[in-house]
Amino acid sequence: MGRPLLDLETVQTYVAIAEFQSFTKAAEALGTTPGAISVMLKRLEARLGCKLIERTPRLVRLSAQGATFLNPAREFIAAHDRAVA
C-alpha cells in the first residue's frame, strides 16, 4: 500500500499541539475546537501507525515518535508554503 498520505491541515494541527503543548491553545490558534484537534491528531496517528502525543488530563507532551516527526512535519509545511508562494 505504500506510505501514508498526509494532508496539510492535519500536519499543521500536530505542529500546533507540539508547539503549544495544549489542545485548547492549539485549537484557539487554528480557529477550531479542542475536540476537532483531538480527532485530527487521532487521524494522523492512525495514518502513521504510532502515538505522537502523550496525553493526560493536565499534560500534553511529545512521544519519542512525535519528537522524531516534528521537524519533518515543519519541513512539510514549509515546502507547501514555498510551493504555493
Model feature map: region roles:
Residues S22-F23, L41, R55:
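Helix-turn-helix DNA-binding elements, focusing on the entry/boundary residues of the two helices
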